[in-house]
Design a protein with these regions (language model features):
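Active-site/substrate-binding loop(s) of hydrolase catalytic cores
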Residues: 2-4, 12-117
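Conserved phosphate/anionic-ligand binding catalytic regions in large, soluble enzymes, centered on
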Residues: 8
Length: 117
C-alpha cells in the first residue's frame, strides 16, 4: 500500500492526515491484522518538503504549490510535482509555461522529489 501527502506545498492537511493514518496503524495493529500483517506499507508524509517549508515561512508564500527548483525566471521557480510523473506527462491538465502553477517541468521526472518516489 502506497500513501503519500504534501505533493502540493500548500496542502498542509495532507501530511498531517498521512501521519495520523500511520499512528492509527501502529497503535491499533491488533484490531486490523488483515491490514498490518498481510500488506506491505510505504508511507511518505511529505513528497515536496522544500515547497512545504517555503509555504509556511511567510504569509505571502501560503498559497505556494510547486517545488522550489530554479527555472531561470525569478518568481517562477518550481514545478508542479503532480504533473512531473512519467505517466501521461504533457498529456493535458498541465502547462509548459514555467510561471504557471501547473508547470509540468522541462522534462519528465525532472524533479528530484519525483525521482526519489
Amino acid at each position: 500500500m502506497w500513501i503519500d501527502g504534501g505533493i502540493h506545498a500548500r496542502e498542509w492537511i495532507s501530511p498531517a492526515t498521512v501521519t495520523w493514518m500511520l499512528k492509527e496503524l501502529v497503535e491499533n495493529d491488533a484490531a486490523h491484522p488483515d491490514l498490518t500483517e498481510k500488506m506491505d506499507w510505504y508511507i511518505l508524509p511529505i513528497v515536496n518538503p522544500d515547497g512545504y517549508a517555503y509555504s509556511r515561512i511567510e504569509d505571502r508564500n501560503r498559497m505556494w504549490r510547486k517545488t522550489r527548483t530554479p527555472n531561470g525566471i525569478h518568481g517562477c521557480e518550481g514545478t508542479d510535482a503532480n504533473r512531473n510523473w512519467g505517466f501521461h506527462w504533457n498529456d493535458g491538465g498541465s502547462s509548459s509555461n514555467s510561471c504557471s502553477e501547473t508547470y509540468m517541468g522541462p522534462e519528465v521526472w525532472s524533479e528530484v522529489e519525483n525521482t526519489y518516489v
